[in-house]
A protein has these predicted regions:
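Structural recognition of an alpha-helix C-terminal capping motif at a helix-to-coil junction
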Residues: 19, 33-40, 44, 55-67
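Internal acidic/polar
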Residues: 79-105, 136
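Residues within helix-turn-helix
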Residues: 29, 138, 149
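A short pre-motif secondary-structure segment
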Residues: 126-130
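Short amphipathic alpha-helical boundary/capping segments
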Residues: 111-120
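DNA-recognition helix of helix-turn-helix
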Residues: 66, 70, 123, 143-168
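Arg/Lys-rich amphipathic alpha helix in sigma70-family domain 2
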Residues: 62-84, 105, 157
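A short, charge-rich alpha-helical start-of-domain segment used by transcription regulators
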Residues: 1-19, 29-32, 43
């Protein structure tokens, strides 16, 4: 693969992979790192012993990016548990949620995003993968290792939680 082909591949997939990862990890720097690692992994596959391998399909790229993002979340969770357990009171707070809620008088995309972001990990993840990425239960099951029935239950609960949060926000207007 030539340098120009590699650059074209990067330009074609970078933003899409970044957005997938950002919706999961909610930290731009980490999402960018995951996106770059995913692209490097894809490009390395084309430079194997045969030298003329095809580039991976979008489904493979999405699956690889999602798995890397979930792994990063697990790593952050372990670090957070460690900090909570062993850090002193004077330690800096590394994991503060971003305050991105913009007050508006009607139900808006920003309010929906904020409501989704306020959900805990399994519910936020399932909503992002189904509603935003357009994946089905079978694809999500192969990515996360969860059973499809579990995913359906999580999705149903996530929708109810999201609706309740949006309704609570509407009543406050």
């Amino acid at each position: 693969m030539t340098r120009e082909e590699s650059i074209a591949f990067y330009k074609e997939h970078a933003r899409w992979l970044f957005n997938i990862s950002l919706r999961i990890v909610r930290e731009p720097a980490l999402a960018e790192e995951i996106m770059q690692d995913t692209i490097l992994k894809a490009l390395r596959q084309t430079h194997g012993p045969e030298g003329n391998r095809k580039l991976p399909e979008r489904a493979w790229l999405a699956k690889t990016c999602i798995r890397a993002s979930i792994d990063a979340l697990r790593r952050i969770k372990r670090e957070r548990l460690f900090l909570d357990e062993y850090a002193s009171d004077g330690a800096p707070e590394y994991f503060s949620p971003a305050d991105s809620d913009i007050p508006e008088e009607r139900l808006s995309v920003n309010k929906i995003k904020a409501a989704i972001e306020s959900l805990s990990d399994p519910y936020r993840l399932i909503l992002n993968l189904i509603l935003i990425e357009g994946l089905d239960y079978e694809e999500i099951s192969s990515i996360t290792g969860e059973r499809e029935g579990t995913l359906r239950t999580q999705y149903s609960r996530a929708r109810k939680m999201l609706a309740a949060r949006l309704m609570a926000g509407q009543e406050g207007l």
